[in-house]
Amino acid sequence: MSVITFTIDGEQYSAKEGDSILHVAREHKIHIPTLCYLEGLSTFGACRLCLVEIEGTTKLFPACTTKPTEGMIVRTNTDKLKKYRKMIVELLASEGNHQCAVCVVNGHCELQDLAYDVGLDHVRFPYLYPEKTLDATHKDFIIDRNRCVLCIRCVRVCHEVEAAHVWDIAGRGIHCEIIADLNQSWGTSPSCTSCGKCVRVCPTGALFEKGAAVGEMQKERGFIKFIVNARTKREWVRVAPEDE
C-alpha cells in the first residue's frame, strides 16, 4: 500500500492510501469539529462542520470524506472556516427546538459543545420552530424529533451494526425527519431489537432513555468502533466455563 505525504496547517504528515484527511488529523491530535461523523460508522459528510481548505481551489471540502493526495496542502482553522462553522451551528440551532435548560443531555451534548467551540452566544437567523413529534411508545426509549440534527447516526448504526434498519429519513427541507420502519410508532416496530445503540450514538437529546432527568444522561459512543473492529477481526470468541 502506497504512502502519501501532504501538509496540514504547515506541517507534513504521511497517510496510507484511502485514509481521509479527518482520519490523519485525528491520528495527530489536530482538532477538526464534527457532528455526523462517528468512528466505526460509514462517512456521510452531511453536517459540513469538518470543512477544510485545500490550496489551489476556492471550494471547501469535508475532511471526513476527502482523501489526501501527494503534495496536497490543507488548512483546518482559517478565519473563513471559523466563520462557516459558526454559521452552520447557528443554522442547526435555528432549525430545531433546542432548549438546553430542560434537555436530558444538558452538559453532555455534542451540539452544545460545538456551540461553545465556535463561540456562539446568539443566533442571527430567525427560528423556524418546525412542528416535530415526540414518540414515547417504545418501552425503554423516547425519540424527540425537535432535538434531531439529522446526522443519521441512528440510521447508520441500526443498519450497519445492528442490521435491523429500523430508522430511515422521510420528508424534505424543514419537514425532513427520522422515521421508524414505514413511518409508524417506534413501539410498534417489528424490526427494533431494543438494543439501544441508536440512543447511545445520538449526539443530542433527540434519543434518550425513559426516566432520564435534565442533564442526567451521558452517552457512551466509543463502543461502536470496538464492535466493528472485533467483527472485522472475527474476535467473537466465547470461552466456556470449566464446569460446562
PLM regions with names:
Residues 9, 17, 44, 172, ...:
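Short glycine-rich loop/turn motifs that provide flexible caps or phosphate-binding loops at active sites
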Residues 1-11:
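Eukaryote-biased recognition of intrinsically disordered, low-complexity regulatory segments
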